[in-house]
């Protein structure tokens, strides 16, 4: 009787606990679940798609420049991206809470960018959305220059140096978005934590911004709290 009771209790407890499941946003075969926005293709449809699949990896070729954007909108999540620069160091970014396309310089969707640029991973860039951090003037410059549109100071510097792996090695960027907060880790180092974000949901996007970047993991997990 006792064993039966304990088994029943165990079963009930197991059924009552819901574990957040990690979901891969990239199936390793094609770009299902994503769409591209590459302004140059409007004028010349013969240009190559800068986002391809190669050896089971998602690859941003860098040119022509543009974005690979999820079809779905996400809110309150952790996204893990494993990436490396395949050749020369360069620029790329992970865009969070993306919405209106081509809102900045006729290229960038309205969003908050978690920078992947070599030696600057984890900077925030405000793209017609805003976010705050402690010591704003130290990390963003004089307040009178702040802004979220062309010509304004949109960069919010990260908190660390040397968090990235040597060129050619794989980096892991983890970003947690919960309500108005965004927190970023690079290879286990907490590199940025913003609050009062003006957007709390949206699409996720990867950039083609001049350099070839390989991605072997892009995965999302729903969250209800920010990690310490």
Locate predicted features.
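Carbohydrate-interacting regions of secretory-pathway proteins
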Residues: 21-228
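Bacterial Sec-dependent N-terminal signal peptides
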Residues: 1-21
């Amino acid at each position: 009787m006792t064993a039966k009771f304990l088994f029943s209790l165990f079963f009930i407890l197991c059924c009552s606990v819901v574990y957040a499941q990690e979901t891969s946003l990239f199936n390793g075969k094609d770009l299902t679940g994503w769409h591209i926005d590459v302004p140059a293709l409007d004028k010349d449809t013969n240009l190559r798609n800068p986002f391809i699949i190669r050896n089971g990896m998602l690859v941003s070729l860098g040119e022509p420049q543009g974005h690979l954007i999820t079809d779905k909108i996400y809110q309150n999540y952790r996204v893990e991206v494993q990436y490396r620069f395949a050749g020369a160091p360069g620029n790329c970014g992970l865009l969070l809470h993306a919405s209106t396309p081509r809102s900045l310089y006729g290229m960038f969707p309205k969003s908050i960018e978690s920078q992947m640029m070599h030696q600057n991973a984890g900077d925030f860039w405000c793209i017609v959305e805003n976010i705050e951090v402690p010591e704003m003037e130290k990390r963003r410059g004089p307040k009178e220059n702040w802004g979220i549109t062309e010509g304004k100071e949109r960069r919010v510097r990260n908190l660390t140096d040397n968090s990235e792996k040597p060129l050619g090695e794989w980096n892991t960027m983890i970003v947690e978005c919960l309500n108005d907060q965004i927190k970023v880790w690079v290879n286990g180092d907490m590199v940025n934590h913003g609050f009062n974000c003006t957007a709390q949901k949206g699409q996720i996007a990867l950039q083609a911004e001049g350099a070839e970047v390989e991605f072997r993991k892009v995965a999302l997990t729903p969250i209800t709290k920010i990690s310490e």
